[in-house]
């Protein structure tokens, strides 16, 4: 069961002026499920994106990178069930055929379409079925289609992930709505996750590009479920410019800071929802590392802890075998780390317990305190490296028996 992840309701999601969303059952992999999503963007919309760093980059990601560079995106098309990764030249041809078909359906050029796929790797995309499903998705286009889209992009997810909020910018109300999917193969940069965030703010392309990268780094690039990096992950931010605010072009201005805070907030909530719905997860863990020389080494330590199977299984069992945390810190690759200056805490919203200091177990630590904290569903591991002022946070979950079962049964 997801960890404190509340099922989203249709009324929770706000339409974004300039964006219409439709879904359809295309039978990509399984019958009788909505697996095709079409998103139409108003003319003049600006789009930014960041994509997987996996060298085995999927065909749709390769095409997305080319098309987004053109600077005039009018549509997004997303299929679930088949990733169209590891499919060679045929995969690229299928992704291109998808863009051609979407362009014909919407009256735009193929180069104005961004394709996205998620699902099983090394299987050919049934492009004929996808294209046959486009008329139904087109007929379904509407401003309030976000709820259905959040469900249509799911794979092993157990709950849809979607967030809306509004913010005042330049005397205008700006609306943001985002959806994401992912539950396994989650580890930056990024993972088997798709994220789509739309707003109606008017913002320069340069600032939108920078903001998208920053938001991804602070959210989707700060989560891990199992340490595997996918071939298909993509995070897209759309700004339609229809809110009526003066275009935001000053990175130091209050308007940009308001938009920045809102985009990062929605991105973090979408990313955390992925971890809360991690395959087989029973605990949501925040790994907060401070006192580093720079953010890079803080993130190294946080990921070493958050990706350790031994740490994750200990948390599943509520077993305070906390030497596993110290071992993970030790192999994180931090040069000249003085373990005698380390301090480690376990915490919840109600309390924080000092576990280790001066290179060993804290004199005040009692195992029953560790057990009490680890029995909670939400736990923070705080580490002070004691060598600087930098800090970083990573979110992860535990490993349960169900993680193995879900992945063993994935293709069945």
Curated annotation (Swiss-Prot):
Listed GO CC annotations: cytoplasm
Catalytic activity: N(2)-acetyl-L-ornithine + L-glutamate = N-acetyl-L-glutamate + L-ornithine; L-glutamate + acetyl-CoA = N-acetyl-L-glutamate + CoA + H(+)
Active site positions: 192 (nucleophile)
UniProt cross-references to Gene3D superfamilies, sorted A to Z: ArgJ beta chain, C-terminal domain (3.10.20.340), L-amino peptidase D-ALA esterase/amidase (3.60.70.12)
Subcellular location: Cytoplasm
Keyword entries, A-Z: Acyltransferase, Amino-acid biosynthesis, Arginine biosynthesis, Autocatalytic cleavage, Cytoplasm, Multifunctional enzyme, Transferase
UniProt GO molecular function: glutamate N-acetyltransferase activity; L-glutamate N-acetyltransferase activity
Sites where the protein binds substrate: 155, 181, 192, 279, 407, 412
Keyword Transferase applies: yes
Residues at the site labelled Involved in the stabilization of negative charge on the oxyanion by the formation of the oxyanion hole: 118-119
Top-rank taxon, per record: Bacteria
Site label Cleavage, positions: 191-192
Enzyme class: transferase
EC number: 2.3.1.35, 2.3.1.1
Pathway: Amino-acid biosynthesis; L-arginine biosynthesis; L-ornithine and N-acetyl-L-glutamate from L-glutamate and N(2)-acetyl-L-ornithine (cyclic): step 1/1; Amino-acid biosynthesis; L-arginine biosynthesis; N(2)-acetyl-L-ornithine from L-glutamate: step 1/4
HAMAP family: ArgJ (MF_01106)
Family: Belongs to the ArgJ family.
NCBIfam families: ArgJ, PRK05388.1
Role this protein plays: Catalyzes two activities which are involved in the cyclic version of arginine biosynthesis: the synthesis of N-acetylglutamate from glutamate and acetyl-CoA as the acetyl donor, and of ornithine by transacetylation between N(2)-acetylornithine and glutamate.
Quaternary structure annotation from Swiss-Prot or TrEMBL: Heterotetramer of two alpha and two beta chains.
Protein name per UniProt: Arginine biosynthesis bifunctional protein ArgJ
Organism, scientific name: Aromatoleum aromaticum (strain DSM 19018 / LMG 30748 / EbN1)
């Amino acid at each position: 069961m997801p960890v404190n992840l509340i099922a989203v309701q249709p009324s929770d999601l706000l339409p974004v002026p300039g964006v219409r969303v439709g879904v359809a059952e295309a039978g990509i992999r399984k019958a009788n499920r909505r697996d095709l999503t079409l998103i139409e963007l108003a003319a003049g919309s600006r789009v930014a994106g960041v994509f997987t760093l996996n060298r085995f980059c999927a065909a749709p990601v390769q095409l997305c990178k080319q098309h987004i560079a053109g600077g005039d995106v009018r549509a997004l098309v997303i299929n679930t069930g088949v990733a169209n990764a590891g499919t060679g030249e045929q995969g690229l041809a299928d992704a291109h055929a998808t863009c051609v078909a979407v362009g014909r359906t919407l009256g735009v050029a193929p180069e104005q379409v961004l394709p996205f796929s998620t699902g099983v790797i090394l299987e050919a995309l049934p492009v004929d079925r996808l294209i046959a499903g486009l008329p139904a998705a087109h007929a379904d286009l509407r401003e309030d289609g976000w709820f259905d889209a959040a469900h249509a992009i799911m794979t092993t997810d157990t709950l849809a992930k979607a967030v809306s909020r509004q913010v005042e910018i330049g005397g205008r109300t700006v609306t943001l709505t985002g959806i994401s999917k992912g539950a396994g193969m989650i580890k930056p940069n990024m993972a088997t996750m798709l994220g789509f965030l739309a707003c109606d703010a008017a913002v320069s392309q340069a600032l939108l590009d920078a903001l998208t990268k920053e938001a991804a780094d602070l959210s989707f690039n700060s989560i891990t479920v199992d340490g595997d990096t996918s071939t298909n992950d993509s995070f897209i931010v759309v700004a339609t410019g229809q809110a009526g605010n003066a275009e935001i072009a000053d990175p130091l201005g209050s308007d940009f800071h308001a938009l920045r805070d809102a985009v990062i907030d929605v991105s973090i909530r979408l990313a955390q929802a992925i971890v809360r719905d991690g395959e087989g997860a029973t605990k949501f863990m925040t790994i907060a590392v401070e006192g580093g020389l720079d953010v890079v080494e803080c993130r190294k330590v946080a990921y070493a802890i958050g990706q350790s199977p031994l740490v994750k299984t200990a948390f599943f069992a509520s077993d305070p075998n906390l030497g596993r945390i110290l071992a993970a810190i030790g192999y994180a690759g931090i040069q000249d780390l003085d373990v005698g200056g380390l301090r480690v805490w376990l915490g919840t919203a109600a309390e924080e317990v000092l576990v280790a200091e001066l290179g060993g177990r804290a004199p005040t630590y009692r195992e029953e305190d560790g057990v009490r904290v680890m029995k909670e569903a939400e736990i923070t591991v705080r580490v002070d490296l004691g060598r600087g002022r930098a800090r970083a946070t990573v979110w992860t979950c535990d490993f349960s028996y169900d993680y193995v079962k879900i992945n063993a049964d994935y293709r069945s």
